Amino acid sequence: LRTNDDTSAFAKDFPNDGQKVVELLQRLRPHWQFDVVPVKDGVFPAQAYDGYVMTGSPASVNDASLPWMAPLLDFIRQLDAEQKPLIGLCFGHQAVAKALGGEVARHSAGWGLGTAPTHWTTTADWMQPSQATTTLMAAHNEQVTRMPEGAVCLGGSDFCPIGSMQISQHIWTTQFHPEMPRVFMQALLGYLSDKLDADTLARAHASLANSADVPLFGQWMVQFFEAC
């Protein structure tokens, strides 16, 4: 479920977010079949799938003026009611929270950019091999501030306390970006160099000294779907 509506020249230099997710998962399960559905254009799946991944987006889940936002939140509620397997990434994490009764707000400390940790307080069965802390790319200035009723926080950090949620056995979300390569983040920071303050950019660049746990997180994602 591609929700990224960025049409800037910068974004066009890279595969879209849906393609990034496909590349991540197809390396691990080459026999799986994938479709990228541009829900940001108001297009929703015309058929049922075994599982869904919702991408990140520069859009805000609180922006009711976007014509595709309300239908997307309704679609999330439908998937939840049908107990369809769903993974939400960044915006997807926030959209799941918003759709199911949680709250999302702008972070008073500003942007989370670069690499960011999730300290896992709960290890689900499909999170194997287990790891106490994972690091992934971050690009957000909003975050989940209240989870939906029944959701469980699996992990987080001081900057982002609700970094990952699980709802029943069929929904898993993360505030972060397992599909985002380091080269994309480096280019994104360059693109934002005249749009953000120097301290935020310096922290983001410095954080890239930490490697991202992309292979491990991708493995957890496919194992989540297989466990559903």
Language model feature labels by segment:
Residues N4-D6, S57-S60, G92:
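Short glycine-rich anion-binding loops that position phosphate/pyrophosphate groups of nucleotides
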Residues D6-P15:
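Short, flexible/disordered intra-domain loops and linkers
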Residues L79-E103:
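Catalytic nucleophile loop
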